[in-house]
Amino acid sequence: MERTYINEVQKEIGSTVKVQGFIENLRNSKYMAFIVLKDITGKLQITVEKEDHPELVDTIDKLTPDSVITVTGKVMENDYVKMGGIEMIPESIEIESIADALPIVRKEIAATKKKKAVERSSIDQRIDYRWIDLRTDENQLMFKAQSCFVNAMRQFLLERSFIEIHTPKLIAAASESGSEVFKVDYFDRNAYLAQSPQFYKQMAMAAGFERIFETGPVFRAEKSYTNKHSTEFSGFDLEFSYITSYKDVMKMEEELLTAGLKAVKEQYGEQIKELFGLEVVVPTTPFPVVKLADLYKGLEEEFGYTVDESEKGDLTTEAERLSYDWVKKHYGHEFLFITDYSAEKRAFYHMRDENGVPQGYVLIRRGVEITTGAQREHRYDVLKKQAEEKGLADDVKFYLEFFQYGCPPHGGFGLGIDRLTMLLCGQSIKDAEFLFRGPNRLTP
């Protein structure tokens, strides 16, 4: 008999089916046993009257929470059952795997008259046993929503003639500078783990691909211990040619994100609200835009936030956080584009205007940076000069060659998929990554 997913059993009332999954809850009394079985699609109550099924008693007595079983039985309607008014009366129960007592507490357990409250294990303890922690409804919903988000963005781009590519993660030179990369031995020389696919995205533009995107790992050798930083994360990058301004890039990104959020809201919005207490907001377009200097001025006037003049060329962590209060007040929006950063704080490959202002932006959502985007410098002589200013000309010699033999104007951006997920469900980056990597975390 083929397996039936639990979300399909309501179509099989009165029929005998086979279901498989983890035991989420087990109540085993003298005369009755109730098993809540969970698979990736839902939950089903298995109801056993022991007098009617004495052959199942020995098997049931061996069961423990989180054990994996296969159950064959008849699907019945029962209005008293909370899980959709449906239960299964089993004919057979086969044990696939018995679970030992769990080493972590995945959810806080409230106190009762007979038992004290049990605190949830810390996030670091839960990451030690991440495969057990990931079985919760909240975690599985988070990754279902992430999958939906990424797939919607992928479809949006494919419908607009983008090509998906996959670039190397072992590279010969750092794409920004040598300070934030992991160095690895590569036979007789050094290599680096890519901190972005930037160089190769632009190589695709020089190759005439015109429109490309990529999803893949990104590595940052930063000793950051915040709830939004990690040393390895999943990136969603794109690049496209024949733009006239970085504003074309901003327009593409806001349309892309809107499509992704719309898909998530339609498929998982109600569940996210139920489990995380957050509304999935599909944003209006265009997104608000502010120059960095104007944002600092607004933050000072409205929130009394000031920074030293030397820091005003970049966005400080506190200004990043306060930007959400500012954009909510003025625009009622979750997103904010910030432009006109100092050239000193931007990558050498960002195009600059006649005043030396980088033609790029940062996108903030709910006070957290999720994107850096820009029009790239495609003119070889100008690009070489900007690389020399940063002291990188020798390190990026191979990259500069991409622009010696013709290259169209182009631009693009990179999104952090894990940060998007984190903000979607109101969790930390440690929760939002399948397996978190940080300065103190390299396992499991």
Predicted regions located by residue number:
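A translation/RNA-centric and nucleic-acid-associated enzymatic feature enriched
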Residues: E180-K262, T285-P444
